[in-house]
Curated annotation (Swiss-Prot):
Any GO CC annotation of this UniProt entry: mitochondrion
CDD domains on file: Complex1_LYR_ETFRF1_LYRM5 (cd20265)
Cellular location(s): Mitochondrion
Gene name of this polypeptide: ETFRF1
Alphabetical UniProt keywords: Mitochondrion
One GO term of the biological process aspect: respiratory electron transport chain
Organism: Homo sapiens (Human)
UniProt family annotation: Belongs to the complex I LYR family.
Top-rank taxon: Eukaryota
Name of this chain's protein: Electron transfer flavoprotein regulatory factor 1
A Pfam family that the UniProt record links to this protein: Complex1_LYR
Principal place of residence: mitochondrion
Role of this protein: Acts as a regulator of the electron transfer flavoprotein by promoting the removal of flavin from the ETF holoenzyme (composed of ETFA and ETFB).
GO molecular function: enzyme inhibitor activity
Length: 90
């Protein structure tokens, strides 16, 4: 029972982190929130601890991908701001 509670906490933490990251999703926060909720509800009946750990790892991978997407978008915007002016003057 102790393991199930710790996994439950990890799942909730993952959900909250993904929900937070979804605020800046390109298709909109509402779109991301609906998809996230559907995915978590689809897997709510999984009881096998190994399968739960696998799903958590998958969710953490998605988190890292989202972070990379956001960093790349910010980098591109910043690069465009700074380097677009120098190209126009030359």
């Amino acid at each position: 029972m102790k393991m199930a509670n710790s996994l439950r906490g990890e799942v909730l933490k993952l959900y909250k982190n993904l929900l937070y990251l979804g605020r800046d999703y390109p298709k909109g926060a509402d779109y991301f929130k609906k998809r996230l909720k559907n995915i978590f509800l689809k897997n709510k009946d999984v009881k096998n601890p190994e399968k739960i750990k696998e799903l958590i790892a998958q969710g953490e991978f998605v988190m890292k991908e989202l972070e990379a997407l956001y960093f790349l978008r910010k980098y591109r915007a910043m690069k465009q701001r700074y380097y677009s002016d120098t190209n126009k003057t030359n």
